[in-house]
């Protein structure tokens, strides 16, 4: 890991209140890594989301259902501790024992770079996700 990535992860952790941050190339891959790590096989999420979300579920063989629940900044994959926080970046936004997947890019809260990140508080999972990313 480069020094600039390490510094960005530390600053993002401080800003969001997350004990650990793992950067990725996009939010979709952050979600995929969390589902793989946690071996999630079923979930429910809003029908009005990014097309890459159901595509990722299909790729992973996850049984999913759509809900008509409206969302604004972020939503939880119901039945899991994983959140799609693609449109959210706020001070102290981290939720304990959760995996919040962020997105950086055009029309997102941090739009001068392209990428993603996972906010979490489990040190062992942090180490595993770092190796997977």
Where do the model's predicted regions map?
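Phosphate-binding glycine-rich loop
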Residues: 5-43, 53-60
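Short acidic donor-binding loop at the edge of a beta-strand
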Residues: 20, 42, 77, 98-99, ...
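A short alpha/beta connector and helix-capping loop motif
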Residues: 92-104
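Conserved core segment of the aminotransferase class I/II
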Residues: 106-133
């Amino acid at each position: 890991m480069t020094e600039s990535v390490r510094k960005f992860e530390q600053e993002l952790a401080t800003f969001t209140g997350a004990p650990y941050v793992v950067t990725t190339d996009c939010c979709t891959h952050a979600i995929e890594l969390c589902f793989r790590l946690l071996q999630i096989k079923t979930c429910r999420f809003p029908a009005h989301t990014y097309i890459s979300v159901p595509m990722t579920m299909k790729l992973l063989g996850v049984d999913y259902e759509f809900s008509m629940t409206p969302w604004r900044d972020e939503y939880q994959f119901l039945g899991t501790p994983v959140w799609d926080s693609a449109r959210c970046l706020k001070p102290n936004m981290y939720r304990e024992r959760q995996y919040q997947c962020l997105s950086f890019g055009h029309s997102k809260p941090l739009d001068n770079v392209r990428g993603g990140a996972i906010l979490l508080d489990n040190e062992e999972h942090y180490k595993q996700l770092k190796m997977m990313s």
